[in-house]
UniProtKB/Swiss-Prot annotation:
PROSITE patterns: HD. It is an enzyme of class 3 (hydrolase). Belongs to the dGTPase family. Type 1 subfamily. Its EC number is 3.1.5.1. This is Deoxyguanosinetriphosphate triphosphohydrolase. SUPFAM superfamilies: HD-domain/PDEase-like. dGTPase preferentially hydrolyzes dGTP over the other canonical NTPs. SMART domains: HDc. Homotetramer. The lineage of its organism: Bacteria, Pseudomonadati, Pseudomonadota, Gammaproteobacteria, Enterobacterales. It comes from Salmonella gallinarum (strain 287/91 / NCTC 13346). It catalyses: dGTP + H2O = 2'-deoxyguanosine + triphosphate + H(+).
Length: 505
């Protein structure tokens, strides 16, 4: 296996207007400080304050949003990164791995990847994702793209329907239909950063949020060697060329991951498991005492000095003693969080170091906290209790169903833009209003200028005399609608749906 040299991975160049020449340690750090500023000040980060973590449309400010969750992930990611660097320093391996002058950028990339990790999520979280994908599947039927004879194809869009004697074009149609019907928050995050917001981040910083390496248009089985890394779509057809360049700049083999992404993933796993349980107590879904009993019984066999006793049991006993006369709830979660971090962060850091050859190559086919250890079992305990007692709660399920209906309803409302012919839509884009299409004109005016410009820019570069043009134009039109609706906050989507459905406020 090739030698480990992080100078080949922490690439501080950018796609546009990249810094030139050899840089000192301080100059490289300033480049990544610029990334921090671009990210923290971006509208995509601000919108996270009104996007769901677990409880949609929550008015209680003590319950987490995507933004407060992401800030917590950022802190845990920083903790893991510092732990890794500290251990490598103790082993005198920083210089060997090319990290002696890159500790600052190493930490910064991890922190900002953590802060950005959810920016592509649509309103209402995973139910928003499901609503988008279900809506498009009902119209494009990507599963029929493999059907024989071609007359069985139920796709309602004529330009995307398979045709006899057009095998090359049919391959593109299959690819486009598969891609459109696999909206995914991580892939949308890549699209936001590069295509929609043009943040022009360093290659290394963008590599930190490429969590999954399967393209959204992938059909068929994935290789066993990358089964975990490719379990979800990681980027769209619209960003295919950009990702190809990213791989080249970061020296990533096909379907491999950037090394620091494993740290971001571990920080997310640690953060949300405890946070979801704390939010459930805040929402009075169960009490701290009930939560402790749920955790106790779900753990199974108990032994003295087990990981459960050292983490959960210790937090429970200290909160009950409550010598400071503080809230039992606050005390329990403070101790639970501290105990969990003190056990899992060092373990995640050591797992990173122990598996560094595979991680550096981007081929480590599992999460840092996904193994047969007690630490992994502890995380699974938190997740299982949340699934059984939080996510299945009637109040949560009702809000999720409402969110699903809101997103589906908004897509129904904007569907006329997808029904226009190529020539009619092109004319609408050029003139912005057409008398013969009053509804479509008003809907088009409501779309974000940023999203409309992204559509115009890419479609204007397509050769109009090519047989592929109608297929690709429709693809980017679908992206335009998905970009707009997925970029809404929960509250904006809810209000927009009610306004357009003429429901009383």
């Amino acid at each position: 296996m090739a030698s480990i040299d992080f100078r080949n991975k922490i690439n501080w160049h950018r796609r546009y207007r990249s810094p030139q020449g050899v840089k000192t340690e301080h100059e490289i750090l300033r480049i990544f400080e610029s990334d921090r500023g671009r990210i923290i000040n971006s509208p995509a980060i601000r919108r996270l304050q009104q996007k769901t973590q677990v409880f949609p449309l929550e008015r209680n400010a003590a319950v987490r949003t995507r933004l407060t969750h992401s800030m917590e992930v950022q802190q845990v990611g920083r903790y893991i990164a510092k732990e890794i660097l500290s251990r490598l320093k103790e082993q005198n391996r920083l210089e060997e791995y090319g990290l002696d002058a890159l500790t600052g950028p190493f930490e910064s990339i991890v922190e900002m990847a953590c802060l950005m990790h959810d920016i592509g999520n649509p309103p209402f979280g995973h139910f928003g994702e499901a609503a988008i994908n279900d809506w498009f599947r009902q119209r494009l039927h990507p599963e029929d793209a493999e059907s024989q004879p071609l007359t069985h194809d139920r796709c309602v869009v004529s330009s995307l329907r398979l045709q006899e004697g057009e095998e090359n074009l049919n391959d593109i149609r299959r690819k486009v239909r598969q891609d459109i019907c696999h909206f995914e928050g991580n892939a949308q995050g890549i699209r936001l950063v590069h295509t929609l917001m043009r943040m022009n981040l360093t290659w290394a910083q963008v590599g930190g949020i490429l969590k999954y390496t399967r393209p959204a248009w992938w059909r068929g089985p994935v290789p066993d060697s990358h089964r975990y890394l490719m379990k979800k779509p990681g980027y769209y057809l619209s960003e295919e060329k950009y990702i190809a360049r990213l791989r080249k700049e970061l020296q990533l083999a096909p379907y491999s991951r950037f090394p620091l992404t494993w740290i971001m993933e571990a920080a997310d796993d640690i953060s949300y498991c405890v946070a979801d349980l704390e939010d459930a107590v805040e929402k009075r879904i169960f009490s701290v005492e009930q939560l402790y009993h749920h955790l106790y019984h779900a753990w199974g066999h108990h032994e003295k000095d087990s990981l459960f006793e050292l983490v959960v049991g210790n937090a429970w006993e200290k909160s009950r003693a409550n010598t400071l006369s503080r809230s039992t709830e606050d005390q329990f979660f403070m101790y639970l969080r501290v105990n969990t971090l003190n056990k899992l962060v060092p373990y995640a850091a050591q797992r990173f170091i122990d598996n560094l050859p595979q991680i550096f190559a981007g081929a480590f086919n599992q999460a840092l906290l996904e193994d047969a250890s007690g630490f992994s079992r502890l995380l699974e305990l938190y997740k299982n209790v949340a699934v059984e007692h939080v996510f299945s709660h009637p109040d949560v399920e009702q809000l999720e169903l409402q969110g699903y209906r809101v997103i589906s309803g908004l897509l129904d409302i904007y569907q006329p833009l997808l029904s226009l012919s190529l020539n009619d839509f092109r004319e609408l884009v050029e003139k912005e209003r057409l008398k013969r299409f009053p509804i479509e004109s008003r809907l088009f005016q409501k779309l974000s200028t940023r999203h409309r410009l992204a559509y115009v820019e890419v479609v204007s570069k397509l050769p109009t005399d090519s047989a592929e043009y109608p297929v690709l134009e429709y693809y980017y039109r679908c992206r335009l609608i998905q970009d707009y609706i997925s970029g809404m906050t929960d509250l904006y989507a809810w209000d927009e749906y009610r306004r357009l459905m003429a429901v009383e406020q």
